[in-house]
Amino acid sequence: MSLWKRISSHVDCEQRMAAYYEEKGMLELRLCLAPWIEDRIMSEQITPNTTDQLERVALKFNEDLQQKLLSTRTASDQALKFRVVELCALIQRISAVELYTHLRSGLQKELQLVTEKSVAATAGQSMPLNPYNMNNTPMVTGYMVDPSDLLAVSNSCNPPVVQGIGPIHNVQNTGIASPALGMVTPKVELYEVQHQIMQSLNEFGNCANALKLLAQNYSYMLNSTSSPNAEAAYRSLIDEKAAIVLTMRRSFMYYESLHEMVIHELKNWRHQQAQAGNGAPFNEGSLDDIQRCFEMLESFIAHMLAAVKELMRVRLVTEEPELTHLLEQVQNAQKNLVCSAFIVDKQPPQVMKTNTRFAASVRWLIGSQLGIHNNPPTVECIIMSEIQSQRFVTRNTQMDNSSLSGQSSGEIQNASSTMEYQQNNHVFSASFRNMQLKKIKRAEKKGTESVMDEKFALFFYTTTTVNDFQIRVWTLSLPVVVIVHGNQEPQSWATITWDNAFAEIVRDPFMITDRVTWAQLSVALNIKFGSCTGRSLTIDNLDFLYEKLQREERSEYITWNQFCKEPMPDRSFTFWEWFFAIMKLTKDHMLGMWKAGCIMGFINKTKAQTDLLRSVYGIGTFLLRFSDSELGGVTIAYVNENGLVTMLAPWTARDFQVLNLADRIRDLDVLCWLHPSDRNASPVKRDVAFGEFYSKRQEPEPLVLDPVTGYVKSTLHVHVCRNGENGSTSGTPHHAQESMQLGNGDFGMADFDTITNFENF
């Protein structure tokens, strides 16, 4: 059955591909010459890797296509003749390269769709929990590669060809898993990829069997004496070999498509890893499933490489450039597979302080394949600037140890580690447990750039030998910002948070957009705050943040400058500095109360006043909101005895180091009912809401002088200044250190740190 017929058997696939071909007006062409197009493109002897090659292949295809169309004009079907004329006109209008690439890409899409549909029929089947147990793989065709051979270690660099292809025979699928392993429903996407790889391997089995027969016939021909049928036998062998080459090319095309799918899954995993740097959920365990795909692909390409080498030993003609080219393609594919499987699985800290220890690890997703683990290489690490990383990646710099030493932008201690293979989980990795950045070289800054905007990356690299040729592999970490002092941390996290949230999956290091929609930014802020504090932001919270960012200007987009560079109106700090300080205050001093919903937090003063005045409980109703004017401050708004709203001066982390927030609230008898952060809930009594957070206070002790120091013990309590009882309708007051006379027993909330209340005197 042709590929298009298989597509047509699924209405959704047919509609999808019809729309794809109709984009260029090629649907009629695809329908009219379906089998010919499939055979012609899939049997290409040269896969175009350069622009010149692509143009030559496309022109040849265009020429053959026109000849094929002209040959159909002799048909008696008048409608067909008319369609041929139209198709010939189409070919004249579209460039040869555009025509060829669109059809070739279409075939790759069709291959993926057909395989996905075949997987859907078996997707409900259970698979063993152990990702390395292949005994229950559904049988797709009459032939299957021996499971033990599929994932076996290729310890020899030059295995015997027949063994390299692997024993291929009928396998009964019992569908019964080992009881000790348990049964689970696998992740469908990765299972589909694994299923497609297995299916392609099974189909390649037919090619392997044909190759064995060809080798036997070739050996018989060489050993036999002259025979009158020798010429016919020779021609037959040539035809058999050509058919095998065609099958191999098709298999290689399948392999390329499958490799692309696995790389896509790995890129998604890396993207999720970056999102996890902001606190997003991340299933690190899915990397084991991706490794399984890499190992299966390595087995696939190893079988193919062995088969090509065996086929080249059947020398029927002097020169076979197409077979030589196929060998080069397969060897390069194996090399690319090995290189792409080298990743950073445990990222270093993305805000990295000099002279501070940190850890990271890299992993090679080929496991025990190729036998590299028997002689594990040593992985080295250097730090690169953004510019150096771009040059290395975009120019595809040839890597050697001598040139890399000059690429480093700093000095890292303990920057080498030998890879280790863990037999129990098939992980082949190198752990850097005690690295330390001693020095950093910075680039010259331009304009408003600061050291906190400058991105670096750790560059991990090693060298190994595979099948007698040397392979150098490398990988980059996520971007890091290097600081030398703690006060550089907030802006550094702005750089990292923006990059993790909005980086494209594929990009040059470390290019990033300078503006995003509010919808995008709100998700990033919510993830960041929620992961740090244990409770997500509400819709009202996010609306308030939107007002803060947009100010008077209403736009769909939020720029990088608005986010962390430009001070907010009438303030000396940026939005990010304000947001980060609140996040830190909440995490360090109010975490339990925030999680319990006791703190409304992100609400403007006007709305706070309105909500409190509308409360049915009236006097004594209060809420906690984050200060607009104070970095890392929280303030209390409450309804006073006159029915007006009073705003207390904000408290900061420095205040909570003396007395925690819950105890401060307990001291204020003017606070009775907590206004709920949930608009659908009712106010809660103060002691019910905050009681679990109160600290245990000791009973007053008799007035006793310490015989050594001569001092009397004292306790601290919070009171509200009398001048605050009339309510405040102005903006939240700035933090002010005011003196007071001890005689009246009252003091301002903002002056708490400078005053001691001696209760026992």
Swiss-Prot record:
The modification Phosphotyrosine is found at residue 711. GO terms for cellular component: cytoplasm; cytoplasmic side of apical plasma membrane; cytosol; nucleoplasm; nucleus. It is found in: Cytoplasm; Nucleus. Pfam families: SH2, STAT_alpha, STAT_bind, STAT_int, STAT_linker. GO terms for biological process: antiviral innate immune response; blastoderm segmentation; border follicle cell migration; cell dedifferentiation; cell surface receptor signaling pathway via JAK-STAT; cell surface receptor signaling pathway via STAT; cellular response to lipopolysaccharide; cellular response to X-ray. Disruption phenotype: Exibits aberrant expression of the pair rule gene even-skipped at the cellular blastoderm stage, leading to larval segmentation defects. Residues 594-658 form the SH2 domain. Tyrosine phosphorylated by hopscotch. Phosphorylation is required for DNA-binding activity and dimerization. Gene3D superfamilies: EF-hand, SH2 domain, STAT transcription factor, all-alpha domain, STAT transcription factor, DNA-binding domain, STAT transcription factor, N-terminal domain. Its main location: cytoplasm. Keywords: Activator, Cytoplasm, Developmental protein, DNA-binding, Nucleus, Phosphoprotein, SH2 domain, Transcription, Transcription regulation. GO terms for molecular function: cytokine receptor binding; DNA binding; DNA-binding transcription activator activity, RNA polymerase II-specific; DNA-binding transcription factor activity, RNA polymerase II-specific; histone binding; RNA polymerase II cis-regulatory region sequence-specific DNA binding. PANTHER family: SIGNAL TRANSDUCER AND ACTIVATOR OF TRANSCRIPTION. Forms a homodimer or a heterodimer with a related family member. Might play a role in signal transduction and activation of transcription. Plays an important role in the segmental pattern formation in the early embryo by activating specific stripes of pair rule gene expression in early development as part of the Janus kinase-STAT pathway. Might play a role in male germline stem cell maintenance. Belongs to the transcription factor STAT family. This is Signal transducer and transcription activator. It comes from Drosophila melanogaster (Fruit fly).
